[in-house]
């Protein structure tokens, strides 16, 4: 089938838009947690064309599964055989290595495009018979969509083996503060793994806090380009920008509602920093918080009914939650400095910063778990399937992006090499 027919227009405009490519990309560097993950084999895909293959599809798939923290693809040199279809798979040879699933496939040139075909094979008979195909598919893509095609395979394999939707076709937005230059501040977007990076906006003045719209077509962020803080919403397809909030005082921390109709943000327009919600259709604004304390960093629950936010009303920053329509707030965090709260996709937990590390609080039991061990962690953002958390931390004299799994076992870095990288925001799903 044609993979392009399954893409939303947002994915096409990422490449067609008049946005500027970035010179240096971030890449995932794994620190710990893979060795204890589930072993799997992704056999090199057979290339059915002349010369060398235009991309190593199997390597991309293996990297995706490894980055999830749930799988540990074995090295090619440890593979007992190199099958390219289910008929060539020897289940016993793989089962002897503790491998219960094998991905095989091939890539074939097709009239200027490329056909990617794969099969996921059960090697231990978990579904009844060893050697059974668990799932299979094929896609025809152009050269620039080869990585996307590989990510599609990864998503399908991941979901089949875990029951959780894959998030390898998502993107991240972040801020880079470059070393020198007349416009050192940049809003950038890349694939979740750092590839295909481009610049959304450059500025001589600070840029902060990018946030995705529900459909992935727009970014909201804070800009100081007019010598004051203002909230900007930018269309990623056309590049068109609109200032939606430029009140006196500070305007910051934008967050789109799950349905995209509202934008929560913080503003000190009346002297104290409070949470407001803007109806993006009418422009009408309602104030959610009040009192003498500062309230900021709003984020939405998955159902759009609750706002999680940070407030110093008790004397130190703590995480609270309240109804998105207003009313009283309840304390989520306890003890120490806590901020940057965000609810997980299933609504069962809140991820936040507590004592400068990433912490997960289970809302049912009240138990907390420290997930990170890095230094001065900030701005956590959760993948749409809830498996991974991206955040920024201090490394040396600068800021870098970090990844940690929601169970705290897998850890990785996305170091930048042309400036400080901060304020990461994980996109929603970009496919149907």
Swiss-Prot record:
Asked if the keyword Transmembrane helix belongs to this entry, the reply reads no
Q: Pfam families from the xrefs?
A: PD40, TolB_N
Provide the GO biological process annotations. cell division; protein import
Question: Which segment of the chain is annotated as a signal peptide?
Answer: 1-24
The cross-references to InterPro entries, in alphabetical order and at most eight, read: 6-blade_b-propeller_TolB-like, PD40, Tol-Pal_TolB, TolB_N
**Coiled coil: which residue ranges?**
none
Task: Recite the UniProt keywords alphabetically.
Answer: Cell cycle, Cell division, Periplasm, Signal
Please tell me one Gene Ontology term that the record gives under cellular component: periplasmic space
Keyword Cell division applies = yes
Subcellular localization is given as: Periplasm
Quick one: where is this thing mainly located? periplasm
Which family would the database say this protein is a member of?
A: Belongs to the TolB family.
Quaternary structure annotation from Swiss-Prot or TrEMBL: The Tol-Pal system is composed of five core proteins: the inner membrane proteins TolA, TolQ and TolR, the periplasmic protein TolB and the outer membrane protein Pal. They form a network linking the inner and outer membranes and the peptidoglycan layer.
Please explain the role this protein plays, according to its UniProt record: Part of the Tol-Pal system, which plays a role in outer membrane invagination during cell division and is important for maintaining outer membrane integrity.
Give the protein's recorded name. Tol-Pal system protein TolB
């Amino acid at each position: 089938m044609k993979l392009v027919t399954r893409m939303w227009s947002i994915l096409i405009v990422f490449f067609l838009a008049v946005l500027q490519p970035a010179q240096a990309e971030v890449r995932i560097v794994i620190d710990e947690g893979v060795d204890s993950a589930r072993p799997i084999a992704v056999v090199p895909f057979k290339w059915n064309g002349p010369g060398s293959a235009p991309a190593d599809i199997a390597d991309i798939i293996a990297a995706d599964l490894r980055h999830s923290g749930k799988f540990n693809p074995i090295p090619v040199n440890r593979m007992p055989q190199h099958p390219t279809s289910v008929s060539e798979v020897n289940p016993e040879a793989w089962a002897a290595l503790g491998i219960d699933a094998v991905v095989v496939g091939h890539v074939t040139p097709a009239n200027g495009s490329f056909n990617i075909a794969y099969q996921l094979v059960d090697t231990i008979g978990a579904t009844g018979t060893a050697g059974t195909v668990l799932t299979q598919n094929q896609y025809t893509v152009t050269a620039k969509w080869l990585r996307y095609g590989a990510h599609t395979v990864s998503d399908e394999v991941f979901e089949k083996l875990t029951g959780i939707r894959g998030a390898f076709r998502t993107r991240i937005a972040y801020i880079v503060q470059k070393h020198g230059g007349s416009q050192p501040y940049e809003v950038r977007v890349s694939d979740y793994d750092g590839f295909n990076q481009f610049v959304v906006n450059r500025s001589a003045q600070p840029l902060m806090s990018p946030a995705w719209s529900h459909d992935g077509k727009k970014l909201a962020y804070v800009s100081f380009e007019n010598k004051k803080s203002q909230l900007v919403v930018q269309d990623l397809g056309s590049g068109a920008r609109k200032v939606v909030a430029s009140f006196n005082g500070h305007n910051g921390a934008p967050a789109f509602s799950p349905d995209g109709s509202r934008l929560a943000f913080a503003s000190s327009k009346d002297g104290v920093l409070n949470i407001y919600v803007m109806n993006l259709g009418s422009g009408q604004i309602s104030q959610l918080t009040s009192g003498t304390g500062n309230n900021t960093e709003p984020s939405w629950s998955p159902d759009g009914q609750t706002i999680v936010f940070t407030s110093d009303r008790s004397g130190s920053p703590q995480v609270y939650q309240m109804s998105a329509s207003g009313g009283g707030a309840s304390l989520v965090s306890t003890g120490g400095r806590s901020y940057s709260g965000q609810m997980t996709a299933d609504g069962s937990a809140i991820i936040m910063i507590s004592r400068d590390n990433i912490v997960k609080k289970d809302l049912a039991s009240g138990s907390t778990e420290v997930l990170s061990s890095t230094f001065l962690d900030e701005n956590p953002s959760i993948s749409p399937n809830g498996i991974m958390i991206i955040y920024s931390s201090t490394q040396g004299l600068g800021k870098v992006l970090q990844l940690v799994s929601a169970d705290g076992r897998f850890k990785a870095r996305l170091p930048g090499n042309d400036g400080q990288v901060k304020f990461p925001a994980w996109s929603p799903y970009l496919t149907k």
